[in-house]
Amino acid sequence: MPRLLIGSVLGGLAMWLVGFVFWGTPLSLLAYKQVAAGDSAALQAALAQHLGPTGTGAYWIPSPGSAAGTELVGRGPNALVQFVNSGIALPDTGALIGGLILAILCVLVAGIALRSCAARASFADRFKLVLLFAAAITLYTDLGQPVFNHMPWGYFTYLWVSDLLSWAAAGAVIAWFLPHPRSEGRE
């Protein structure tokens, strides 16, 4: 159990660090299209005016909830707007701490699964198992967005690469820290 907990903390830290490289540095700009400063300010004002009263949420624009909305969706342009009503600090320390805690919990769940199903497997086999599950899950959840919901391929491909590499780093750590078949009884 101590190795599982230590591996989860260190694996979560590895996952968080990879995520930070992708999303907390200028590298993250690869995921986004840029608009001119004047257009950005005008869009922000329009968001505040039209979405501010209804609050934080995800908005499909135009809304396909009516016949007229469905016709507008068919004509385009369309957007899925992830709207936050309040300002945020960049970097947001609260989000960084919350993200680290989430990463540790996710690696703990993966470690429990590995320990339950692959306790007698070698490090290489456990690592392969994590990579295969990470690839399958992130392919569906990340790249499923452009496939099913017509979201932008560039952003979600970048997200997929960051998620897959985060899980690869975390998987290597947790697979290493779980007791090896040769060391059973020494935990």
Regions found by a protein language model. Give the residues of each.
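N-terminal signal-anchor transmembrane alpha helix
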Residues: 3-46
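Internal alpha-helical transmembrane segments of multi-pass membrane proteins
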Residues: 3-4, 116-135, 184-185
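Transmembrane alpha-helical segments of integral membrane proteins
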Residues: 138-149
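Non-cytosolic membrane-interface motifs at loop->transmembrane helix junctions
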Residues: 151-162
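Hydrophobic cores of alpha-helical transmembrane segments in multi-pass inner/ER membrane proteins
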Residues: 106, 166-176
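Transmembrane alpha-helical segments in integral membrane proteins
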Residues: 98-119
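Individual transmembrane alpha-helix segments
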Residues: 60-103
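A juxtamembrane structural motif centered on a specific transmembrane helix
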Residues: 172-187
